[in-house]
Amino acid sequence: MGRANVKHVARHGITPEECEEAYRNGPMVIERQRRKHERRRLCLGETQRGRLLTFVVIERKGKVRFVTAYPMHGLQRRVYRGENE
């Protein structure tokens, strides 16, 4: 994760390790966008400690880059829980 992105997600109280963990745990992709030859995905995921995160990733040349991440809000939490119970 780039330094600017680390600072950005830190403002939301999230660490890079939490982002990577939620991604590795098989996130639910709820929206896909294409912007400037990039595929952005809005994802809902959970850390090993049960923290629910929303994050946006870009997949480029086989690598994943986190654009932003923040704690899930109510509607996202309901969608995630409904799909993963």
Describe the predicted segments one by one.
Residues 1-85:
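Ribonuclease/tRNase effector modules and their secretory precursors
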